[in-house]
Amino acid sequence: MPTPYLSGSAVALVTPFKSDSSIDFEAIARLTEFHVAAGTNIIIPCGTTGESPTLAEEEQVAIIKTVVEAAQGKLMVAAGAGTNNTHHAVELAKNAEKAGAAAILSVAPYYNKPSQEGFYQHYRHIAEAVAVPIIIYNVPGRTGCNVAASTILRLARDFDNVLAVKEASENFTQISELLEERPSNFAVLTGEDSLILPFMAMGGNGVISVAANEIPAQIRQLVESAGSGDLVTARTLYSRYRKLLKLNFIESNPVPVKYALARMGMIEENYRLPLVPLSAESKRAMDEELTLLGLV
């Protein structure tokens, strides 16, 4: 099977804030350059890890433009552009496309719990509104509902620009169905860093990663080694960074990873409510691991 267009190691980029809660655009540009140097394949601003629920539309557009400019065409920019209101999701997708995003990541409608036909119609409207590739984001743990494999596959077959899914269901039956039945140009990406090794061994195409914020080169190497069958290298990398992957979710994402990046001197440690800083206990655990790994 040929390698799908949207493959490899993608970073779910954090959004750095200043102490007054304004966006730190200089830090965003530096982070983007960091990922270019590390060989990250795809950078995704304005997703869950980017605290998208707290970003105004004009802020999202400005962030995307900043990332596109800093990337200089050296890696793909696939912007988060989803919500549970279909009309608004279409507008966000159009905004991202106009801002220069080469693809969009659109989360499944949450809270209102649509039927599978509702999911299909939601993504149909988005696919018909933009020309850029669309990544469906299926994350039942956050949305409270699952986009079935049959619905994802139906969308992939019906629309030329529905080219990937970020599958964060941890449902290996669903993952297997997607991998076995997908069109040849459709990428199946895991949204769980802890599943990279088994996911790639099953034939997955990559990851949209939180840990790639901290260790982008290592996540890319893990994806590449696992995908090529070099399981010795893949297992060695996974074993070394397994605890960090877990600690990134010791409290709600992206609080732990932003704390880690601040400790690494890459951003200021600021959040927008309702997110708040890590507890002292979680900070101690993260500090210990960052020191052990030589990241601070």
UniProtKB/Swiss-Prot annotation:
Q: Which CDD domains match?
A: DHDPS
Pathway it belongs to?
A: Amino-acid biosynthesis; L-lysine biosynthesis via DAP pathway; (S)-tetrahydrodipicolinate from L-aspartate: step 3/4
Q: Which Gene3D superfamilies match?
A: Aldolase class I
Site (Part of a proton relay during catalysis): which residue positions?
Answer: T48, Y111
Q: Where is the active site?
A: Y137 (proton donor/acceptor), K166 (schiff-base intermediate with substrate)
Tell me the residue numbers annotated for binding pyruvate: T49, I208
E.C. number: 4.3.3.7
GO biological process terms on file: diaminopimelate biosynthetic process; lysine biosynthetic process via diaminopimelate
Q: Give the source's domain of life in one word.
A: Bacteria
Instruction: Offer an example of a GO molecular function term for this protein.
Output: 4-hydroxy-tetrahydrodipicolinate synthase activity
Catalytic activity field: L-aspartate 4-semialdehyde + pyruvate = (2S,4S)-4-hydroxy-2,3,4,5-tetrahydrodipicolinate + H2O + H(+)
Keywords, comma-separated and alphabetical: Amino-acid biosynthesis, Cytoplasm, Diaminopimelate biosynthesis, Lyase, Lysine biosynthesis, Schiff base
Compartments, as annotated in UniProt: Cytoplasm
Listed under GO cellular component are: cytosol
Record family assignment? Belongs to the DapA family.
Q: Sum up the protein's function in the record's words.
A: Catalyzes the condensation of (S)-aspartate-beta-semialdehyde [(S)-ASA] and pyruvate to 4-hydroxy-tetrahydrodipicolinate (HTPA).
Q: Which NCBIfam families match?
A: dapA (TIGR00674)
Q: How does it assemble?
A: Homotetramer; dimer of dimers.
Full protein name? 4-hydroxy-tetrahydrodipicolinate synthase
Q: What would be the name of the gene that encodes this protein?
A: dapA
